[in-house]
Amino acid sequence: GSEMCIRDSLCPTQELVDAYEMADGTTPILGYNADGSPIINSESGYSEEGFTEEADAEGYYPENTFNMFVDREPRFYATVTYSGAYWRGRQIDFRMGAPDGRTGGPDYTTTGYLMRKFLDEDGVDILRGVFVNKTWNYFRLGELYLNYAEALNEASGPVDDVYKYVNLIRKRSGLPGLKAGLSQDEMRQKIRRERQVELALETHRYFDCNRWKISDQVKAVHGMDIGARDNSFFKRTLVEERVFEAPKHYLWPFHQDEVNKNPDIFVQNPGWGGIN
């Protein structure tokens, strides 16, 4: 999963935050233990303890930023608003009871993150009725590159063109190219991660997970502890355990009335018998 929320639009999940690389292209989270805790890459410089004392020289994060969000790749800062990030000249605070946190009403982030991607920080003022129209990208060049790279890797393995088009995406994002000598499966995992972050919040993740047949492996949704009033907010917390039954949920049901019109040739999808 990449996002969930109630009234605050799309809320990125901890799993999406984990997918972003460090600024130097290293992978901070190598996987997860059985209890959902992260397997941290000790060589990445990533930490889930403490706060930075200095702001980023390029302005990606301010001082007193939780170290989880320090020195991440540029796409992270362009996509996710985290507690401590700046928005319209002030530092956001999602802790319980804080100006941007849960205060008793329905307007709060359920994961401790909000979407920044697509938002106009300067031109929108909802309270005054000022809006900015955005053109939705149903298909864009980055997706085309990743589609081609994925298909070519599945057909021929990690040949030169696979590296070329994945690295075009990475270069534009300020990241170094992939290391040479990856196996087909290693490249497959790199492409999947690249799709997760490059196309984040663009309605791809659900369908990607289904066609890769991994939706039954990515059911848990984690975030920060939005019920905390102090720095214990910055603790991984289970937000939701989703239900996904494989193979049933990889297909949607036909309306049973349609199946009943010609049951000899029209067969309901597996697991969905009796759907009306």
Cite the ranges covered by each PLM segment:
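Acidic/polar-rich alpha-helix caps and helix-coil junctions
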Residues: 2-3, 7-276
